[in-house]
C-alpha cells in the first residue's frame, strides 16, 4: 500500500501519525512493513529569519514523526530553551515577534548551511530526516521559493501592504484588516523531486485536515501538482478541517473569510471541488453531525477528532473504506 498525503504543520503532522498507526510505520512499527507513506509538505510558511531558513511545516512533521515535538505546543522541540532568543532581544534585533528556540536553531543552521552550499531543499530535508528517522518520506512541495504573503491594512499607518504569512500569523494573529493572499514565486516554481510521482504512483491520495487556504492551498498553487491530482489513477480523499462551523486549531476560519468561503464542511468541500468536474475530490469526510452534499463526491460523516493516533487511524481507515481501498 502506497499512501500519499498533502499536509501542513501541526494538524497535518498529527494526521500522519494516524496513518503510521494504521500502517504500522515509524514509532508504531513492530518489524518490516510492506506499506509506504509519503507526505507532500507545504512550504508557503518558509522564511528567512535572523539569517537562517525556517521551514515550519517540514520541521513540525519531522519532529512529530521522529518523537522530538513539544507535545504541549504541537510545534518546536521538546525540552526547548530560549537563550538565543533572549540574547537577540537584548541586542534589539528585529523581528522581535518571532522566536527561535535553541534546539530548533540547530536545525535551521544545518539547513541554511546546506542551502548556501547549493543543496536543494529536498536533499536538505532528506539529510535532516536521517537524524530523526520519521518513518515516512517527507517531500517539500517544491525546491524553489514559493511563499505565502498576505495583503493587509497596516495598523500603523492605514496603508495597504503585503507582509509575509509568518508576520500575519505570529505577530498579528490574523487580527488585522486582511484583503487577500498571494503565493509569491509559486507560478515560477516546479513540483519538488518525487512529488508528482508520489501522487501518480499512490494507491490513495489523502488531503489532511490542514488549513485549506494557507497549508493545502499553497501546495496546489505550484504548477504540476493540481494536474497530478486530477490525473492520478488513485482516489483522492479529503478530510474537513471544520467541525461544527469552527476549526479545531489555527485560524482556518479567518483565512476562509478572507477568500469568501464559509467555515462549513460543505463550503470547504466545494472549495476543493469534485474531480468529476474541475476539482480534486473523489471523496470527502466530514465530522459526525456535520453535513455536506457535493455533486460528484462521495461524502461520509465519521468522527474527525484527532484525540490520539488510534482515533486518527480510524479516520484514515474511514477514508480508505470510502474509496474502496483495502490494506
Swiss-Prot record:
Molecular function via GO: LPPG:FO 2-phospho-L-lactate transferase activity; magnesium ion binding
- Describe its partners and assembly state: Homodimer.
Describe the function of this protein: Catalyzes the transfer of the phosphoenolpyruvate moiety from enoylpyruvoyl-2-diphospho-5'-guanosine (EPPG) to 7,8-didemethyl-8-hydroxy-5-deazariboflavin (FO) with the formation of dehydro coenzyme F420-0 and GMP.
For this entry, the protein name equals Phosphoenolpyruvate transferase
Q: Does the keyword Electron transport apply?
A: no
Similarity field: Belongs to the CofD family.
**Catalytic activity, as annotated:** enolpyruvoyl-2-diphospho-5'-guanosine + 7,8-didemethyl-8-hydroxy-5-deazariboflavin = dehydro coenzyme F420-0 + GMP + H(+)
Pfam families with a match to the protein in the record: CofD
Q: Which cofactor does it need?
A: Mg(2+)
Q: Which CDD domains match?
A: CofD_like
InterPro entries named among the record's database cross-references: CofD, CofD-like_dom_sf, FbiA/CofD
- Work out whether the entry's keyword set contains Magnesium: yes
Q: Which UniProt keywords apply?
A: Magnesium, Transferase
Kindly list the positions annotated as binding 7,8-didemethyl-8-hydroxy-5-deazariboflavin.
Answer: 59
EC numbers = 2.7.8.28
Q: Which pathway, metabolic or otherwise, does it act in? A: Cofactor biosynthesis; coenzyme F420 biosynthesis
Amino acid at each position: 500500500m502506497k499512501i500519499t498525503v498533502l499536509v501542513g504543520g501541526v494538524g497535518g503532522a498529527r494526521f500522519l501519525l494516524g496513518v503510521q498507526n494504521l500502517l504500522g510505520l515509524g514509532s508504531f512499527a513492530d518489524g518490516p512493513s510492506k506499506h509506504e507513506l509519503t507526505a507532500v509538505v507545504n512550504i508557503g510558511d518558509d522564511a528567512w529569519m535572523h539569517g537562517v531558513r525556517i521551514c515550519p511545516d517540514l520541521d513540525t512533521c519531522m519532529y512529530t514523526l521522529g518523537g522530538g515535538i513539544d507535545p504541549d505546543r504541537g510545534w518546536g522541540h521538546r525540552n526547548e530553551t530560549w537563550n538565543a532568543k533572549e540574547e537577540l532581544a537584548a541586542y534589539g534585533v528585529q523581528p522581535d515577534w518571532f522566536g527561535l528556540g535553541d534546539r530548533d536553531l540547530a536545525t535551521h543552521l544545518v539547513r541554511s548551511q546546506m542551502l548556501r552550499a547549493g543543496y536543494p531543499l529536498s536533499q536538505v530535508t532528506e539529510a535532516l530526516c536521517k537524524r530523526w528517522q520519521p518513518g515516512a518520506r517527507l517531500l517539500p512541495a517544491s525546491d524553489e521559493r514559493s511563499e505565502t504573503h498576505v495583503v493587509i491594512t497596516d495598523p500603523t499607518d492605514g496603508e495597504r501592504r503585503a507582509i509575509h504569512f509568518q508576520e500575519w500569523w505570529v505577530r498579528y494573529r490574523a487580527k488585522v484588516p486582511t484583503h487577500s493572499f498571494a503565493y509569491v514565486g509559486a507560478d515560477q516554481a516546479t513540483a519538488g523531486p518525487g512529488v508528482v510521482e508520489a501522487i501518480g504512483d499512490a494507491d490513495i491520495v489523502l488531503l489532511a485536515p490542514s488549513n485549506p487556504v494557507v497549508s493545502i492551498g499553497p501546495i496546489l498553487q505550484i504548477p504540476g501538482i493540481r494536474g497530478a491530482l486530477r490525473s492520478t489513477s488513485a482516489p483522492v480523499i479529503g478530510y474537513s478541517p471544520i467541525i461544527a462551523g469552527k476549526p479545531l486549531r489555527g485560524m482556518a476560519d479567518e483565512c476562509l473569510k478572507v477568500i469568501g468561503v464559509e467555515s462549513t464542511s460543505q463550503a470547504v468541500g466545494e472549495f476543493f471541488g469534485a474531480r468529476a468536474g474541475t476539482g480534486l475530490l473523489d471523496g470527502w469526510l466530514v465530522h459526525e453531525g456535520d453535513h455536506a452534499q457535493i455533486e460528484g463526491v462521495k461524502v461520509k460523516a465519521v468522527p474527525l477528532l484527532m484525540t490520539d493516533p488510534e482515533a486518527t487511524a480510524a479516520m484514515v481507515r474511514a477514508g480508505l473504506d470510502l474509496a474502496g481501498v483495502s490494506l
